[in-house]
Amino acid sequence: MPKPTKGPRLGGSSSHQKALLANLATSLFEHGRIKTTEPKARALRPYAEKLITHAKKGTLHNRREVMKKIRDKDVVHVLFAEIGPFFADRSGGYTRIIKVENRKGDNAPMAVIELVREKTVTSEANRARRADAAQKAASAGAQEVTAAAAPQAAVEPEAVETEASAETAEAEVETAEVEAVDEASAEEADEATEVEKADDDK
């Protein structure tokens, strides 16, 4: 169940506060910036940004929701045709509040609330800094991968050479064994031949 915000209302009643915020939002969308008291500016900011979010979606339902609060059709047209598309790539923070000198007479704290129309130098610098940091991180990661792969590549030829030398040694041993067997069989054949000759002589 929705409940009213705690604390005093602007204007003294709920209906007066709704009308006050609607009129302030209409003036803000029409002129781009307005000067009002600081409490009114802080109350207007979320109210106006929700209307801008409706304008970004741009459907008929959103237009009818905005028309419930902003009764000036020309201002609604500007909101949906210009302001909404301008903030299409921005996910929030469509307005800014700047404190100014207190009002003469009653010394009320004053502020200027305006639409953020320009791209600030700070945001551009932050974006460039983040891009540079991402590139440096990517290059550092690539260097680490290359450095890790180099020792493995150096170890692999050594392992191949070791395996080749082991295979060569095994082949030499097998060859020596075969030669020894051949020599033994040749000696046995010679001995058998000599025995046969001796028998023939007898």
UniProtKB/Swiss-Prot annotation:
**Any one cellular component term from GO for this entry?**
cytosolic large ribosomal subunit
An annotated GO BP:
translation
Q: Which Pfam families match?
A: Ribosomal_L17
Has keyword Chaperone? no
Q: Where is this region: Disordered?
A: 132-202
The record, for InterPro entries, names: Ribosomal_bL17, Ribosomal_bL17_CS, Ribosomal_bL17_sf
Q: Where is the composition biased (Low complexity)?
A: 134-168
A single GO molecular-function term is: structural constituent of ribosome
What keywords appear on the UniProt entry? Ribonucleoprotein, Ribosomal protein
| Record's compositionally biased regions (Acidic residues) | 169-193
Family membership: Belongs to the bacterial ribosomal protein bL17 family.
The record's note on quaternary structure and interaction partners says: Part of the 50S ribosomal subunit. Contacts protein L32.
- Name used for this protein in its record: Large ribosomal subunit protein bL17
Which lineage?
Bacteria, Bacillati, Actinomycetota, Actinomycetes, Mycobacteriales
* Name of the gene this protein is made from: rplQ
